[in-house]
Structures are given as C-alpha cells and as structure tokens.
C-alpha cells in the first residue's frame, strides 16, 4: 500500500531512501548554519572587530594625519571654483586675460549728473567725495571684469569674485612652470598650461 502510494505521487523507492539518508547525514547537519550563529551581540567589541582590525587601529603608523592648512585652503578654493565655474565662463575668462585693459581713471567716462544744488556743508562734501571715489573704482572694475559693463553693481561684484578665483588658480598653475624658464610673457601660454593640467 505504501509502495503504491509513493508510486502514485511519482516518487520512487530509491529517491525516498536517498532522501532519508541525506536527512540523517552528519556532514549535512554540520554544514547547515545554526540560528544562534546568525545572531550578534552588538555590545561586544569582539563581534564587531577582529583582533587583527583592533591591532591595525591601535598601530600608530596607520593613523591618518591631517593635511597642512595651506592644502585645505587650496582644496576649498578648488571646490568652490568647480561649483561656480563652467566651461563657457572659463573660456570667456581666458579670452579676457589676453585682452589689454585700460584702467586709467581719466579715460573712464563719468555718468551724467542732473542739475542739483550742491551743499557746501563740510560733512556733505566729504561724503560726496567718498561716494565719487567708490563710483570711480566700480566703473574701473566694470572695465576689468569680463562683461561687467553690461551688469548692475551687485552682479558685477559677484562676477569679480569668480574672476579673481580664476586668476588665482592660473597663478598657482603657472608658478611651477615659471621656475623652469617658460616664456610667461606670451599670454597664449595661459590656455596651454591650463589645458595641460589633469
């Protein structure tokens, strides 16, 4: 009856016998992971770190040292530079570097003033002269910054900050080449040395 039931289900006697032998095999029982092996006591350091890892961390030769402050400053500047600078803006700065700039205050046109009464009060005169000097410097800066003549004062100052970062980066790039006698008088080397950097 049992043999007929096994045959009806499509299971032969050899399969049943092999299955029963495999269940009682000591080798298989040793290979199967036990439930308590999968649990970890997170309060014990030995479960988290092996002795080799602990020895590695305690070795003073493997301690990480902080980089010098100068390196950190350069890294911060490069990160800000990469965020603020795109390829088109960088090409615009490259072209502006090779263009001559006239920053003579006498050649900077002054804005037309309306006919207003000028006070003779000493404090008013000093304040007016201070504002005139600031306005003159802003007009000169607009001629230096690429595209600054078409910007308002706030946008031009933001562009001046980015342009200054670009120029500082160019100085750092060209300093090693100036020590080996590179012809730095030619502005075209700015593009060459910049593009040759990794």
From Swiss-Prot:
Keywords recorded for this protein, A-Z: DNA-binding, Nucleus, Transcription, Transcription regulation
Pfam family, one: HLH
InterPro entries hit by this protein: bHLH_dom, HLH_DNA-bd_sf, IND-like
Protein name: Transcription factor IND
Domain bHLH, first and last residues per copy: 118-167
Keyword Iron included in the entry's annotation: no
Function recorded in the entry: Transcription regulator required for seed dispersal. Involved in the differentiation of all three cell types required for fruit dehiscence. Acts as the key regulator in a network including SHP and ALC that controls specification of the valve margin. Works with ALC, SHP, and FUL to allow differentiation of the lignified valve layer, the spring-loaded mechanism of fruit that promotes opening. Regulates the expression of the YJ80 marker.
Location(s) in or outside the cell: Nucleus
Quaternary structure annotation from Swiss-Prot or TrEMBL: Homodimer. Heterodimer; possibly with ALC.
A GO CC annotation given for this chain: nucleus
UniProt-listed PANTHER family: TRANSCRIPTION FACTOR HEC3-RELATED (PTHR45914), TRANSCRIPTION FACTOR IND (PTHR45914:SF63)
Region called Disordered, residue ranges: 1-33
A GO molecular-function descriptor: DNA binding
One biological process term in Gene Ontology: polar nucleus fusion
Tissue and organ expression note: After fertilization, it is expressed in stripes about four cells wide at the margins of developing wild-type fruit. Also expressed in the inner valve layer, which becomes lignified later in fruit development. Detected in roots.
Reported impact of residue 141 to F: In ind-1; defects in margin definition, especially at the fruit base
Keyword Nucleus: yes
Domain of life: Eukaryota
Signal peptide residue numbers: none
Induction trigger: By FUL, which restrict its expression to the margins.
């Amino acid at each position: 009856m049992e043999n007929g039931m096994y045959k009806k289900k499509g299971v032969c006697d050899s399969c049943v016998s092999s299955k029963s032998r495999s269940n009682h095999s000591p080798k298989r029982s040793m290979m199967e992971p036990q439930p308590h092996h999968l649990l970890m006591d997170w309060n014990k350091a030995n479960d988290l770190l092996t002795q080799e890892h602990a020895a590695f961390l305690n070795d003073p030769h493997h301690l990480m040292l902080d980089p010098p402050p100068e390196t950190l400053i350069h890294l911060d500047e490069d990160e800000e530079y990469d965020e603020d600078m795109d390829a088109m803006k960088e090409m615009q700065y490259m072209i502006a570097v090779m263009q001559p700039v006239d920053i003579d205050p006498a050649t900077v046109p002054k804005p037309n003033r309306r006919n207003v009464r000028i006070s003779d009060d000493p404090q008013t005169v000093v304040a007016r002269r201070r504002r005139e000097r600031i306005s003159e410097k802003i007009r000169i800066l607009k001629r230096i910054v690429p595209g600054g003549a078409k910007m308002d004062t706030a946008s031009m100052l933001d562009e001046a900050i980015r342009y200054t970062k670009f120029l500082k980066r160019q100085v750092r790039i060209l300093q090693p080449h100036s020590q080996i006698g590179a012809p730095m008088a030619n502005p075209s080397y700015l593009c060459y040395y910049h593009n040759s950097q990794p």
